[in-house]
Curated annotation (Swiss-Prot):
Organism: Drosophila melanogaster
This protein's name: Centrosomin
Highest taxon in the source lineage: Eukaryota
Subunit structure: Monomer.
Disulfide bonds: none
Sequence motif Nuclear localization signal, residues: 644-656
Residue ranges the record marks as coiled coil: 97-516, 626-654, 712-983
Reported consequences of knocking out the gene: RNAi-mediated knockdown has no effect on nuclear positioning in fat body cells.
């Protein structure tokens, strides 16, 4: 096996080029053109046969060892063993194709040997014809020599006659010897031909056996290739399953990675939340410290308020003293009113008098001036303050800025007033709540009272004003601190909620991780159990099947691959963990840096606060510290910190997204999907284009078939082809048949490609076959197979047409045979002729070939001066009738030969049609039809033999030699019949063998279909299992996702990812379905390939049948040659009879001359006297000598035959010549009757000597005419032979051109088909 692999490894590259084509090339000229190469001997053929048998035995041994070695290979079904088996199968295919090529070369050599034998037979026939022509020329020469003698004296004549008779006898003996030799040579040639034919038949039988064996080997190879393809398909399906498993593993790994990333993100978010909580705790602690400080300050302020209330109580006691001073205040108010009128333009505060009791003690801003009224009691003042808080809050905002200073000392105090100065110090205080407003108003009233008291006591009010401003500031800071505390509490609550959610999410993810680990452990346990179960049958000693062994190997391979993939994924996970650690470290560093910077800022602020506390007095220390803390934790800075945290979170999210994009190449997947869609669209467009091309090709082939049918119908009409010759008609018929076959083969190829044509018509093309054919279309019928459709559409009309043509030809033959007897009788009757005296005797003597010229021109003969008036009626009539019968027989034989050729052509067409019907699996019916055709041919041959025997009996040739020849012919015919019977038996045996082969092929196809169905069922079951597993997995994932969604809203992202996985799984299922469709398409293509191989086998059988047809053609040619030899023999016998008659007449004339009786009455009707007769004889002898010496005595007339180029014109000329001769004979007979009627008494007075003289002259003239006729016929035969040869050459050239054109078109179609297949 290894040696065969190494020897034929170079042939594996050319497997696509090697095609098992069984086309046997015929010679270019048909049966007439011999090949230059010589045939092989029987010994060489036997040696080749022995070598082929050895090769066949070696191939069988190789197949047997391959079949024995298959179970082990199946047990070891690995990829390497399968590849080795594929290589071995390819090598065997190459070797088998080589053997097929060698056997095709043997078939070609056999065809060449047949053509060589035909050439040898043709050469032998030509040599025999040349010998016969030489003998005829010698006879003519002797006859001319006899006719050239001068009858001066009877003694000289007798001597010459004796000498001539001796020479004639000698020549006859030579002729007999030559004929015997020729017969012996022919017998030897026939014996050699019979041996060669037997050897050829044996070789053909062996070749057929080898072809059958080769077909069996090809079938075995197809089976092996089918098994290899099935194994490849199984491997592909397993690869697809592996890829699906890999994808599932990848999906699981990606899901695990995503879960790990989510865990890491959650851990990071927890860390960040913890950091934020720490920061918030620190801020809360700071705020609590500030609140404590402010509570202390509030306590101190309350103490101060209590002190102020005590003072107010003291002052209430002193109110009585103050009432006494009201007079003074009134006077002062009057003065102020007067001054107000004066100082309106200066914007000085004017104290108006009290208008109403309700308005007492209220103060408002009015266009930059303070209007003050008399004070009220505390209760009423507080009510007034509550009712006018909003007005004060709005109006105070439009007052002067707090930086404005108001002098208090001296005249300024009296100028502006106390309330105006106090309000100028409080105008910058912002809006405060109601409680604080009440408090502030109370304080202001107290301050006013204090101011009034202190004015009376003359104490400065600067310190009190500073305390009020500090009090207002503290209140505002308290409000702001409360608001900030509320916001921080809200943020703290949100952070606690997020931390709780994260903790819940972490717990759920930990549970999921535990579940996944448990599932992985369960799957690992299952795999271990499967491995144990796989190991158990091998350990128990049970023989595993191929499927179990393959599943075991697949499980081990899958486990190894899964382990490798898991290791790789763990390494990747470790790498990713290291990267995540690095990135978390970087993030921690960044966060630490930012925290460190913030701590630095806090330290700086604390230092500034410490410095300010040192500089400020004790009263302002607490407020300054609180203000610094408040500045360090303002809302703007808090928002900035939050924004920074958000930015950091965004950066972390971006980094995680980048990592996820690096792992899941979603963009690449999208691009690949787009490319897939583009490729699918391109494939769809290519399929559409291919279907359109197939439609166009099918329509064109249909139109070609219609045109061929149209031409075929035209060929049936006699009006169209009545002018053409038979050979051209046959050539046209063959061309039309070949075009029909080509269109049918194209239709078969298009039907095999399984393309259904919706519309088989184009707008530019019309249906031409409807002109002469009115049969209905069968295109709308439904058929069970392509072969039945092809048979119903194409083969049935051709078979019917051929049968009708055969019946018409048979009817014409019967009519011709029935009308032949009538024609013979009509031609044997004398025809009336008109005698014209247009020529003189000198013209008649100077133009001895005038009859020939007139016959060729088409005129009747008018010069009858050479005919004797007293010619014998009985002899002329008998000779004319014999000539007429011979001519009629020749005509009939030629016509029968033509008809037989036509029948043979039609039979060839029938055989071709039957060979085409082999494609329809009806070989048994074909063999029956061929048997019927053979029986019909036998009946025709028997009828022809009976007609020939009847003709021979009518002629009266009862000689022994003819009987022997007829018996020999009968024996040959019987042998042919036996051979045909043997051929029939062999054909029936072949048909039975083919039926057995068809049954075996059908069984094999059924087995293959069963295997395919089993494989499809297994694949469907596997797919269902995978679908069920996928559905279960999906359900589990959905359940988990639902639980996760119920636990936490963050699990929606994982649910979306699982939905994407679901889509990917559905796409993978679609991909598997597309793979199933592709596998089905490959199955259909394999079936088409098997059909193509069957078609090639059928073509090989067709070529074998063509070889049989060529053999039958050779037999027909042989029969024609035998007929021709028989005709020549008949001519020789007729010449011998005429020569014997001449000898008898001469002997009679010699007897009369010896008696010495003469008469003067005899010489008168001959024309001139004896001297003139001698001159006339000399002139005739000179003319005859010139005729013998020159090739054409009448150049002007002989050249006419050379000008005519068609075979039909020569036939017409021969027919006209024969009719003219009959007319001349008829013209001679009435002359004789008239002479008999005019001179009845002259016969009794004629002397014997004169009669002999006249008889000799007539015999000489008849001999001369016969020689001329023989020469003319010989030349006519030569001309016709040359024309036939040229026509055959032209026909062969036309056939060669047509073949080349068909081959070119076939190659073009093959290239187109290969290009279309490559594009598809």
């Amino acid at each position: 096996m290894n040696s065969n692999r190494t020897s034929s490894s170079h042939n594996s590259r050319n497997l696509k080029i090697l095609n098992a084509s069984f086309d046997v090339p015929r010679p270019p000229g048909g049966g007439n053109s011999p090949l230059p190469s010589q045939g092989r001997s029987v010994r060489e053929l036997e040696e080749q046969m022995s070598a082929l048998r050895k090769e066949n035995f070696n191939l069988k041994l190789r197949i047997y060892f391959l079949e024995e070695g298959q179970p082990g290979a199946r047990a070891d079904s690995s990829t390497e063993s399968l590849s080795k088996q594929l290589i071995d199968a390819k090598i065997e295919i190459a070797t088998l194709r080589k053997t097929v090529d060698v056997k095709m070369e043997l078939l070609k050599d056999a065809a060449r040997a047949i053509s060589h034998h035909e050439e040898l037979q043709r050469k032998a026939d030509i040599d025999s014809q040349a010998i016969i022509d030489e003998l005829q020329e010698q006879i003519h020469a002797y006859q001319m020599a006899e006719s050239g003698g001068q009858p001066v004296e009877n003694i000289a004549k007798t001597r010459k006659m004796l000498r001539l008779e001796s020479e004639v006898q000698r020549l006859e003996e030579e002729l007999v010897n030559i004929e015997a030799r020729n017969v012996a040579a022919r017998n030897e040639l026939e014996f050699m031909l019979a041996e060669r034919l037997e050897s050829l038949t044996a070789c053909e039988g062996k070749i057929q056996e080898l072809a059958i064996k080769n077909s069996e080997l090809v079938e075995r190879l197809e089976k092996e290739t089918a098994s290899a393809e099935s194994s490849n398909e199984a491997i592909d399906s397993l690869k697809v399953e592996l890829e699906a498993c890999r994808k599932e593993n990848q999906d699981l790994v990606t899901s695990i990675r995503t879960l790990k990333h989510d865990m890491k993100r959650q851990v990071r978010s927890m860390k960040e939340a913890a950091n934020t909580m720490d920061v918030q705790r620190q801020s809360i602690l700071l705020l609590e410290a500030t609140i404590k400080r402010k509570e202390k300050s509030c306590g101190s302020m309350q103490k101060n308020v209590l002190n102020y209330e005590a003072l107010i109580a003291k002052l209430n006691a002193e109110l009585e003293t103050m009432r006494q001073q009201n007079v003074y205040f009134r006077e002062l108010s009057e003065n102020l009113q007067q001054k107000e009128v004066r100082q309106l333009d200066r914007g000085v505060a004017i104290v108006q008098p009290m208008r109403m009791t309700a308005d007492a003690g209220r103060f408002v801003w009015q266009s930059g001036t303070i209007v003050a009224q008399e004070p009220l009691p505390l209760e009423r003042q507080s009510a007034a303050a509550t009712s006018n808080v909003s007005v004060s809050a709005v109006r105070l905002s439009s007052g002067p800025p707090p930086d404005q200073t108001y002098p208090v000392n001296g005249h300024d105090r009296a100028k502006y007033g106390l309330l105006q100065l106090f309000a100028a110090k409080l105008d910058w205080i912002s809006a405060v709540p109601l409680a604080l407003g009440h408090l502030a108003l109370k304080i202001i009233l107290l301050a006013m009272r204090l101011h009034s008291c202190l004015q009376n006591v003359h104490i400065p009010l600067r310190a009190n004003r500073d305390l009020g401003a500090q009090l207002a500031d503290k209140i505002c800071e308290l409000q702001e601190a409360q608001e900030k505390l509320k916001e921080r509490e809200r943020i703290h609550e949100q952070a606690c909620r997020t931390i709780q959610k994260l903790m819940q999410k972490l717990s759920s993810q930990e549970k999921e991780i535990k579940k996944l680990n448990q599932e992985n452990e369960q799957s690992a346990n299952k795999e271990n159990d499967c491995a144990k179960t796989v190991i158990s049958p091998s350990s128990s000693g049970r023989s595993m099947s191929d499927n179990e062994a393959s599943s075991q190997e697949m499980s081990t391979n899958l486990r190894v691959r899964y382990e490798l993939k898991i290791n790789e994924q763990e390494e990747k996970i470790k790498q990713l963990q290291t990267e995540v650690k690095k990135k978390t470290a970087n993030l921690q560093n960044l966060v630490n840096k930012e925290l460190w910077e913030k701590n630095r800022e806090v330290e700086r602020l604390t230092k500034l606060l410490a410095n300010q506390q040192k500089t400020l007095p004790q009263i302002s220390e607490e407020s300054a510290g609180e203000a610094d803390l408040q500045q360090s934790f303002t809302e703007a800075e808090y928002m900035r910190a939050l924004e920074r945290n958000k930015l950091l979170q965004r950066k972390v999210d971006v980094l995680f997204q980048r990592l996820a994009d690096d792992q899941q190449n979603s963009a690449v997947i999208g691009q690949l999907r787009l490319e897939l869609q583009q490729a699918r669209t391109e494939v769809e467009t290519a399929d559409k284009w291919r279907l359109e091309c197939v439609d166009v090709c099918s329509v064109l082939t249909n139109r070609l078939e219609e045109l061929a049918g149209f031409l075929n119908s035209l060929l049936k009409h006699k009006d169209v082809l009545g002018v053409l010759a038979a050979d051209r008609r046959n050539a046209m018929r063959k061309a039309v048949d070949r075009s029909l076959d080509l269109s049918k083969s194209l239709n078969m190829t298009l039907n095999i490609t399984a393309t259904s044509l919706a519309d088989q018509s184009l707008a530019q093309l019309c249906n031409l076959s409807e002109i002469l054919y009115t049969e209905g279309d069968a295109s709308h019928k439904t058929f069970n197979s392509h072969e039945e459709l092809h048979a119903a559409t194409s083969m049935a009309p051709t078979v019917e047409n051929l049968k009708a043509e055969n019946k018409a030809l048979k009817k014409e033959l019967e009519k011709r045979r029935s009308s032949e007897g009538q024609r013979k009788e009509r031609r044997s009757l004398p025809l009336p002729s008109q005698q014209f005296d247009n020529q003189s005797e000198s013209e008649a003597w100077s133009e001895p070939d005038r009859k020939v010229s007139l016959a060729r021109i088409g005129l009747d003969e008018t010069s009858n001066s050479l005919a004797a008036p007293e010619q014998a009626i009985s002899e002329s009539e008998s000779e004319g009738r014999t000539c007429a019968t011979r001519q009629d027989r020749n005509r009939n034989s030629e016509r029968i030969a033509q008809l037989e050729e036509q029948i043979a052509q039609k039979d060839e067409r029938m055989l071709n049609v039957q060979c085409q019907m082999v494609e329809l699996d009806n070989r048994y019916k074909q063999e029956q039809l061929r048997c019927l055709d053979i029986t019909q041919q036998l009946e025709q041959l028997r009828a022809i033999n009976e007609a020939l025997t009847a003709d021979l009996h009518a002629i009266g040739s009862h000689e022994e030699e003819r009987m022997v020849e007829l018996q020999r012919q009968l024996e040959l015919k019987n042998q042919q019949i036996d051979q045909l019977k043997l051929a029939h038996s062999t054909l029936t045996a072949d048909s039975q063998i083919t039926e057995m082969e068809l049954q075996a092929l059908q069984q094999q196809m059924q087995e293959i279909e069963q295997l395919h169905a089993d494989s499809v069922e297994t694949l469907q079951s596997q797919l269902q299992k995978l679908k069920l597993d996928a559905v279960q997995q999906l359900e589990e994932h959905e359940r988990l996702h639902r639980e996760a969604l119920e636990r936490d809203w963050v699990a929606l992202t994982t649910y979306q990812e699982q939905a994407q996985q679901l889509l990917e799984l559905q796409r993978s299922l679609d991909y598997h379905q597309e793979n199933e469709k592709e596998l089905k398409q490959t199955l259909v293509e394999n079936e088409l390939a098997t059909r193509a191989l069957k078609k090639q086998l059928d073509e090989s059988t067709l070529q074998a049948s063509k070889a049989v047809m060529e053999r039958t053609k050779a037999y027909n040619d042989k029969l024609q040659l035998e007929k021709r030899s028989e005709e020549l023999r008949l001519q020789l016998e007729a010449l011998k009879e005429e020569h014997q008659k001449l000898l008898q007449k001469r002997s009679n004339s010699s007897d009369v001359s010896q008696s010495g009786y003469t008469s003067e009455e005899v010489a008168v009707p001959m024309g001139p006297p004896s001297g003139q007769a001698t001159t006339c004889k000399q002139a005739a002898a000179a003319v005859l000598g010139q005729r013998v010496n020159t090739s054409s005595p009448d150049l002007g007339i002989e050249s006419d035959a050379g000008r005519i180029s068609s075979v039909e014109v020569s036939n017409a000329q021969r027919a006209m010549l024969k009719t003219v001769e009959m007319k001349t004979e008829g013209s001679a007979s009435p002359k004789a009757k008239s002479e008999e009627s005019t001179s009845p008494d002259s016969k009794s007075n004629v002397a014997t000597g004169a009669a002999t003289v006249h008889d000799c002259a007539k015999v000489d003239l008849e001999n001369a005419e016969l020689r001329r006729k023989l020469i003319r016929t010989k030349r006519a035969f030569e001309d016709t032979y040359e024309k036939l040869r040229m026509a055959n050459k032209a026909k062969a050239q036309v056939e060669k051109d047509i073949k080349n054109q068909i081959l070119k078109t076939h190659n073009v179609l093959r290239n187109v088909r290969s290009n279309m297949e490559n594009e598809l």
